[in-house]
Amino acid sequence: MQLSQSDLSAESELRWLRSRTKPRSADTYRNALPMPENHAMDSPTDLLDFATRHPRLLVLTGAGCSTGAGIPDYRDANGEWKRSAPMQFQLFVGNELARRRYWARSMIGWRTMSQATPTAAHRALVRLESAGRIALLVTQNVDGLHNAAGSRDVVDLHGRIDTVCCMGCGTRSRRLALQQELSQRNPHWALLDARSGPDGDADLEHQDFARFDVPACTVCGGMLKPDVVFFGESVPRERVAAVRAALAGADALLVAGSSLMVYSGYRFVEDAVAAGKPVAVVNIGRTRADAVLTLKVDHDVSTALDALATRLGA
């Protein structure tokens, strides 16, 4: 397929937008609470006391749970972006060059995602779930590692990168099958390498993305999209409702490995605070919720959760 002149002329605009903009959705940063520069840090021992006093936890996880699997996280200890902005929904659906660029980079990044295995954090949460300590496990990650570790009741808030959906007919298919077709259609691209990101993207630049061949849906010929929630796209209402229902029955909220900078996850901190439920965070560095936390453990999440599960006899 030939790209239109508008698509070709959009290349410089796309590069500028991707390098300059910070990802925001309609939800992002809404109703943000102040984030103080200093916050008293608690210890992993305090986490044990927190879990003992609140035996049924709603657990919300973020990228920090998967860094030990070789999947990078989004932000540094100050909550700032480590890499260029992730794909924006409106850009993906509205610009063919942007879609080609996304799938080219995703084809490279998929290698890291598909080979990742669960970390000690994932395994500790399986133990806690088996011991009846988790009311619901909610993850902002798209890597599927909680299920791979053996967790049974998981809400993938932002979807799963191992699934592809058609924006025309809604058909869902396995990403592995698409990966094989992308490699067959673009054999020379398969030889390239670049650093992967937490969303399955890769830092691939300075390529002629207009030449990357992306297949259409085999059912209706529609546009294919990874089955994940892009920035600027809404989390499905039924997922939010399921989390809120579980939070209502939980004793407290535990956040593991997330800075909570994106509102899709932070909203549940707001819900917990409004309901008078305590909130604990295990995360290295600053979080958006620091001003309202009951407990803040600035510690490696895998080490902290593994120790917690062991001390609880899980």
Question: Where is each model-derived feature located?
Answer:
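Conserved catalytic core of sirtuin-type NAD+-dependent deacylases
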Residues: 2-314
